[in-house]
């Protein structure tokens, strides 16, 4: 991955954001892939929140193309590392869309969704909502992909953890 800082300095997130509404799936997933790289540093996550990127990414979770869903979920996962990102995703009703992706046929979609949900479970309101979807997360612990099964176990521990 190239250094994202020069891209952030020239406002790449804001410049790429409008392209997320393109009609061509190849454009959307490639833009989302670039946005993931830009949201790795903390400053990129903050910029994404400040410009309302979550609002444009959540609808992509329902896209027909698996790469669009995969990369949209990865960007949301990256943004949800920070508290502001968690609440932006919760406010845009992203939690329910991510839960629905736990049953997706594409392993990368399931993995990114469960990792994003794990981060949302760190917020009290996210944890509360995820308790209602614990069965879906528990089912994923039996996934044939060991990485996904392990991520689901981590999500379940995070959701059910009590202080």
Question: Which role does the model predict for each range below?
Answer:
Residues 1-163:
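Long amphipathic alpha-helical tracts in eukaryotic proteins
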């Amino acid at each position: 991955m190239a250094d994202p800082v020069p891209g952030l300095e020239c406002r790449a997130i804001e410049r790429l954001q409008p392209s997320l509404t393109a009609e061509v799936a190849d454009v959307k997933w490639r833009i989302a892939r670039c946005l993931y790289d830009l949201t790795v540093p903390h400053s990129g996550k903050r910029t994404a929140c400040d410009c309302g990127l979550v609002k444009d990414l959540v609808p992509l979770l329902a896209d027909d193309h698996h790469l669009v869903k995969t990369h949209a979920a990865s960007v949301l996962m990256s943004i949800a590392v920070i508290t502001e990102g968690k609440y932006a995703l919760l406010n845009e009703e992203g939690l329910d869309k991510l839960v629905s992706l736990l049953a997706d046929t594409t392993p990368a979609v399931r993995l990114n969704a469960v990792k994003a949900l794990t981060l949302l479970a760190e917020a009290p309101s996210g944890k509360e909502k995820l308790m209602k979807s614990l069965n879906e997360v528990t089912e994923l612990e039996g996934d044939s992909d060991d990485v996904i099964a392990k991520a689901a176990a981590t999500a379940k521990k995070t959701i059910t953890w009590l202080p």
